[in-house]
Amino acid sequence: SEYVLVFASGEGQESIVQHWETVVDWGDEWNYFLGVTNPPTGWIHSDFDDSEWLSGVSGFGYGDNDDATIIPPYMSNFVRKSFDIESIDNIARIILHIDYDDAFVAYLNGIEIARSNIGTPGIAPNYNEGSYEWHEAVMYTGGYPEEYEIDFESNMLVNEGNILAIQVHNYNQTSSDMSLIPFLTLGMLEEPSEPIGPSETLNFPMTNLHADFKIESEGETLILTNPVGEVIDVVDSVSVPTDVSFGRQPDGGSELVFF
Protein backbone atom coordinates (compact mmCIF):
# COMPACT_ATOMS: atom_id res chain seq x y z
CA SER A 1 0.00 0.00 0.00
CA GLU A 2 1.07 3.60 -0.55
CA TYR A 3 1.18 6.40 2.00
CA VAL A 4 2.22 10.03 2.27
CA LEU A 5 4.40 11.16 5.20
CA VAL A 6 3.61 14.71 6.39
CA PHE A 7 5.49 16.33 9.28
CA ALA A 8 3.43 18.55 11.57
CA SER A 9 6.29 21.04 11.87
CA GLY A 10 4.55 24.33 11.13
CA GLU A 11 6.98 24.95 8.25
CA GLY A 12 4.39 24.71 5.45
CA GLN A 13 6.78 22.97 3.04
CA GLU A 14 4.84 21.62 0.05
CA SER A 15 7.69 20.16 -2.01
CA ILE A 16 7.41 16.53 -3.03
CA VAL A 17 11.18 16.40 -3.51
CA GLN A 18 12.76 13.70 -1.35
CA HIS A 19 16.34 14.03 -2.61
CA TRP A 20 18.51 16.75 -4.20
CA GLU A 21 21.13 15.63 -6.71
CA THR A 22 23.64 18.09 -8.20
CA VAL A 23 24.46 16.65 -11.62
CA VAL A 24 26.63 19.60 -12.71
CA ASP A 25 28.90 20.94 -9.99
CA TRP A 26 31.70 23.46 -9.49
CA GLY A 27 34.94 21.90 -10.71
CA ASP A 28 33.34 19.54 -13.25
CA GLU A 29 34.97 19.17 -16.65
CA TRP A 30 33.36 20.89 -19.64
CA ASN A 31 34.10 21.35 -23.33
CA TYR A 32 34.38 24.97 -24.42
CA PHE A 33 34.68 27.18 -27.49
CA LEU A 34 36.42 30.57 -27.32
CA GLY A 35 34.30 33.45 -28.55
CA VAL A 36 36.37 34.65 -31.50
CA THR A 37 33.38 33.81 -33.71
CA ASN A 38 29.97 32.22 -33.30
CA PRO A 39 30.17 28.48 -32.54
CA PRO A 40 28.91 26.02 -35.16
CA THR A 41 25.16 25.74 -35.67
CA GLY A 42 23.50 23.33 -33.28
CA TRP A 43 26.06 23.68 -30.52
CA ILE A 44 23.33 23.83 -27.84
CA HIS A 45 21.84 20.46 -28.82
CA SER A 46 22.66 17.06 -27.37
CA ASP A 47 23.59 15.50 -30.72
CA PHE A 48 26.28 18.12 -31.49
CA ASP A 49 29.84 16.78 -31.72
CA ASP A 50 32.10 18.88 -29.48
CA SER A 51 35.02 16.44 -29.50
CA GLU A 52 37.25 19.03 -31.19
CA TRP A 53 36.51 21.71 -28.59
CA LEU A 54 38.88 22.58 -25.77
CA SER A 55 38.23 21.07 -22.34
CA GLY A 56 38.61 22.44 -18.83
CA VAL A 57 37.00 22.54 -15.40
CA SER A 58 34.74 25.27 -14.07
CA GLY A 59 34.97 28.13 -13.27
CA PHE A 60 35.86 29.74 -16.56
CA GLY A 61 37.16 33.25 -17.06
CA TYR A 62 39.96 35.58 -16.06
CA GLY A 63 40.77 38.41 -13.71
CA ASP A 64 39.05 37.45 -10.42
CA ASN A 65 41.12 34.50 -9.18
CA ASP A 66 37.98 32.34 -9.26
CA ASP A 67 38.89 30.74 -12.58
CA ALA A 68 40.11 27.14 -12.73
CA THR A 69 40.20 27.42 -16.53
CA ILE A 70 41.65 30.76 -17.59
CA ILE A 71 40.58 31.96 -21.02
CA PRO A 72 41.77 34.92 -23.13
CA PRO A 73 39.94 38.25 -22.66
CA TYR A 74 37.37 37.75 -25.41
CA MET A 75 33.79 39.02 -25.48
CA SER A 76 32.32 35.55 -24.95
CA ASN A 77 32.90 31.89 -24.20
CA PHE A 78 30.68 28.90 -25.00
CA VAL A 79 30.62 25.78 -22.79
CA ARG A 80 28.95 22.35 -22.85
CA LYS A 81 28.58 19.70 -20.16
CA SER A 82 26.92 16.27 -20.47
CA PHE A 83 25.19 14.34 -17.70
CA ASP A 84 23.02 11.23 -17.33
CA ILE A 85 19.93 10.51 -15.23
CA GLU A 86 18.93 7.15 -13.82
CA SER A 87 15.22 7.81 -14.50
CA ILE A 88 13.56 10.94 -15.86
CA ASP A 89 10.31 9.79 -14.23
CA ASN A 90 12.00 10.45 -10.88
CA ILE A 91 12.54 14.17 -11.55
CA ALA A 92 10.26 16.76 -9.92
CA ARG A 93 12.31 19.98 -10.08
CA ILE A 94 15.33 21.48 -11.86
CA ILE A 95 17.35 24.33 -10.37
CA LEU A 96 20.17 26.22 -12.07
CA HIS A 97 22.63 28.12 -9.88
CA ILE A 98 25.13 30.31 -11.66
CA ASP A 99 27.80 32.83 -10.77
CA TYR A 100 28.73 34.99 -13.74
CA ASP A 101 30.34 38.15 -15.04
CA ASP A 102 28.77 39.89 -16.98
CA ALA A 103 25.90 38.06 -18.77
CA PHE A 104 24.82 34.55 -19.75
CA VAL A 105 22.29 32.42 -21.61
CA ALA A 106 21.75 28.79 -20.55
CA TYR A 107 20.24 25.94 -22.56
CA LEU A 108 19.19 22.42 -21.61
CA ASN A 109 19.12 19.96 -24.51
CA GLY A 110 18.65 22.85 -26.92
CA ILE A 111 15.94 24.64 -24.91
CA GLU A 112 16.71 28.06 -23.44
CA ILE A 113 16.13 27.82 -19.68
CA ALA A 114 17.61 31.04 -18.28
CA ARG A 115 19.38 34.25 -19.24
CA SER A 116 20.48 37.47 -17.61
CA ASN A 117 21.67 40.89 -18.72
CA ILE A 118 21.76 40.28 -22.47
CA GLY A 119 19.57 40.12 -25.55
CA THR A 120 16.03 38.90 -26.18
CA PRO A 121 14.74 35.56 -24.86
CA GLY A 122 14.66 33.00 -27.65
CA ILE A 123 17.33 34.77 -29.71
CA ALA A 124 20.92 33.63 -29.20
CA PRO A 125 23.34 36.56 -28.78
CA ASN A 126 26.18 36.82 -31.28
CA TYR A 127 29.67 36.08 -29.99
CA ASN A 128 30.60 39.80 -30.01
CA GLU A 129 27.45 41.06 -28.28
CA GLY A 130 28.03 42.75 -24.93
CA SER A 131 25.95 42.70 -21.77
CA TYR A 132 23.53 45.51 -20.95
CA GLU A 133 25.57 46.57 -17.95
CA TRP A 134 28.39 45.48 -15.67
CA HIS A 135 27.60 42.49 -13.47
CA GLU A 136 30.15 41.26 -10.97
CA ALA A 137 30.51 37.63 -9.89
CA VAL A 138 29.99 37.14 -6.16
CA MET A 139 31.31 33.75 -5.09
CA TYR A 140 34.95 34.85 -4.98
CA THR A 141 34.00 37.39 -2.30
CA GLY A 142 31.88 34.91 -0.31
CA GLY A 143 28.55 35.53 -2.05
CA TYR A 144 25.93 33.03 -3.19
CA PRO A 145 25.28 32.26 -6.87
CA GLU A 146 22.03 33.34 -8.52
CA GLU A 147 19.26 30.73 -8.51
CA TYR A 148 16.88 29.96 -11.38
CA GLU A 149 13.95 27.58 -10.93
CA ILE A 150 13.44 25.91 -14.31
CA ASP A 151 9.92 25.30 -15.64
CA PHE A 152 10.32 21.55 -15.85
CA GLU A 153 8.62 19.42 -18.49
CA SER A 154 9.37 15.72 -18.87
CA ASN A 155 10.44 16.10 -22.52
CA MET A 156 13.29 18.41 -21.50
CA LEU A 157 15.43 15.51 -20.28
CA VAL A 158 16.54 12.07 -21.40
CA ASN A 159 18.14 9.31 -19.36
CA GLU A 160 21.49 9.47 -21.17
CA GLY A 161 23.38 12.25 -22.91
CA ASN A 162 21.76 15.41 -21.55
CA ILE A 163 23.61 18.63 -22.39
CA LEU A 164 23.77 21.83 -20.36
CA ALA A 165 25.13 24.54 -22.67
CA ILE A 166 25.94 28.11 -21.61
CA GLN A 167 27.29 31.20 -23.32
CA VAL A 168 28.84 33.87 -21.10
CA HIS A 169 29.49 37.43 -22.28
CA ASN A 170 31.51 40.43 -21.21
CA TYR A 171 30.30 44.01 -21.07
CA ASN A 172 32.92 45.17 -23.58
CA GLN A 173 36.29 44.22 -25.03
CA THR A 174 38.24 46.10 -22.37
CA SER A 175 36.54 44.35 -19.44
CA SER A 176 39.00 43.46 -16.69
CA ASP A 177 37.36 40.14 -15.81
CA MET A 178 34.97 37.36 -16.81
CA SER A 179 33.48 34.57 -14.68
CA LEU A 180 31.29 31.51 -15.16
CA ILE A 181 30.57 28.91 -12.46
CA PRO A 182 27.37 26.91 -13.16
CA PHE A 183 25.53 24.27 -11.13
CA LEU A 184 22.54 22.15 -12.14
CA THR A 185 20.58 20.28 -9.48
CA LEU A 186 17.65 17.89 -9.83
CA GLY A 187 14.93 17.50 -7.22
CA MET A 188 13.99 13.81 -7.14
CA LEU A 189 10.96 11.92 -5.89
CA GLU A 190 13.26 9.31 -4.37
CA GLU A 191 16.98 8.78 -3.91
CA PRO A 192 18.74 7.18 -6.92
CA SER A 193 20.60 3.88 -6.57
CA GLU A 194 24.01 5.63 -6.50
CA PRO A 195 23.34 9.09 -5.03
CA ILE A 196 25.84 11.93 -5.18
CA GLY A 197 23.74 14.41 -3.23
CA PRO A 198 23.65 18.20 -3.45
CA SER A 199 26.70 20.38 -3.97
CA GLU A 200 28.37 21.42 -0.73
CA THR A 201 28.31 24.99 -2.07
CA LEU A 202 24.51 25.20 -2.32
CA ASN A 203 21.54 25.31 0.04
CA PHE A 204 18.23 23.55 -0.63
CA PRO A 205 14.84 23.43 1.11
CA MET A 206 13.64 20.56 3.27
CA THR A 207 13.00 17.32 1.39
CA ASN A 208 9.70 16.29 2.97
CA LEU A 209 6.11 17.50 3.16
CA HIS A 210 5.60 19.72 6.20
CA ALA A 211 2.20 20.94 7.37
CA ASP A 212 1.67 24.61 8.24
CA PHE A 213 0.56 23.66 11.76
CA LYS A 214 2.08 21.97 14.79
CA ILE A 215 0.57 19.52 17.28
CA GLU A 216 0.63 20.75 20.86
CA SER A 217 2.77 18.63 23.18
CA GLU A 218 -0.12 18.16 25.62
CA GLY A 219 -2.20 16.69 22.78
CA GLU A 220 -5.12 17.87 20.69
CA THR A 221 -7.76 16.54 18.34
CA LEU A 222 -6.81 16.01 14.68
CA ILE A 223 -9.58 16.17 12.10
CA LEU A 224 -9.27 14.99 8.48
CA THR A 225 -11.72 16.51 6.01
CA ASN A 226 -12.27 16.25 2.29
CA PRO A 227 -12.12 19.29 -0.07
CA VAL A 228 -15.76 20.24 0.65
CA GLY A 229 -15.25 20.18 4.42
CA GLU A 230 -16.85 16.83 5.24
CA VAL A 231 -15.18 15.05 8.17
CA ILE A 232 -13.41 11.85 7.07
CA ASP A 233 -11.69 10.89 10.32
CA VAL A 234 -11.01 12.18 13.83
CA VAL A 235 -8.24 11.11 16.20
CA ASP A 236 -6.80 12.45 19.45
CA SER A 237 -3.01 12.83 19.45
CA VAL A 238 -1.16 10.67 21.97
CA SER A 239 2.44 10.23 23.08
CA VAL A 240 4.14 8.11 20.40
CA PRO A 241 7.59 6.52 20.96
CA THR A 242 10.40 7.05 18.43
CA ASP A 243 10.13 4.93 15.26
CA VAL A 244 6.57 3.92 16.15
CA SER A 245 3.38 4.97 14.35
CA PHE A 246 -0.15 5.41 15.67
CA GLY A 247 -3.18 4.88 13.46
CA ARG A 248 -5.98 2.67 12.27
CA GLN A 249 -5.29 -1.01 11.64
CA PRO A 250 -6.43 -2.09 9.15
CA ASP A 251 -6.55 1.12 7.13
CA GLY A 252 -10.03 2.57 7.52
CA GLY A 253 -10.83 0.31 10.47
CA SER A 254 -12.25 1.36 13.82
CA GLU A 255 -9.33 0.32 16.05
CA LEU A 256 -6.39 2.70 16.75
CA VAL A 257 -3.11 0.91 17.47
CA PHE A 258 0.65 1.43 17.71
CA PHE A 259 2.60 -0.19 14.86
What is each PLM-predicted segment?
Residues 107-110:
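Short strand-turn-strand beta-turns centered on an Asx-Gly dipeptide
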Residues 1-93, 105, 115-259:
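Intrinsically disordered, low-complexity linkers and terminal tails enriched in Ser/Thr/Pro/Gly
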Residues 99-102:
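Short proline/glycine-enriched turn/loop motifs at strand-loop junctions of beta-rich domains
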